[in-house]
C-alpha cells in the first residue's frame, strides 16, 4: 500500500484478499458486469494509483481505434469537491494534456436516481429481515468550506441549524 502512513498501511493490508485490494477486485467485477451490458469497451481508472486515467484512455484507444466519444462514470453517487469534482477535473486535464482525439463527457452524480436507490434498498433488505439491535450508517464527511462553496443558492447551506430540513436545490451539493 504505497504512500500511506504505517498505521493506515497496516489497516489496508488487513482487508486485502488473495485477489488483492477489495476496491480493485470489486471495481473489476463491476467493469465485467457493465461490459456485458454495452457494446463499447469498458475500462476502469483510478484518480490516485493504478490503473491510471491515462492508461485507461490509452487502452480504450487500442481497443477501439478511431474512438470518438468517451463517457466517464465517476463512482461517487454524490457530488463533493473532494471526490467527484477532483476526479472529473483530473480526467479532463489528462484528456487535454494527452491530446486524445475523442470527446469526453461525465455522468452526473446519481445519489437520487431511482435505480441507485432501489439497489441500496435491495442490498439492505435481507438484513432487515433479521433480528438486530441497531443499524449503523457510515458516511464520509465533507469539509464545511466545500459545502459553503458548492451552495448554488449562496444562502442556504450551513446558514442555520435547520438548513437540511428545508428542501433546496443546494442539497445536490452537500
PLM feature spans:
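Active-site-proximal alpha-helix that buttresses catalytic centers in soluble enzyme cores
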Residues: 1-174
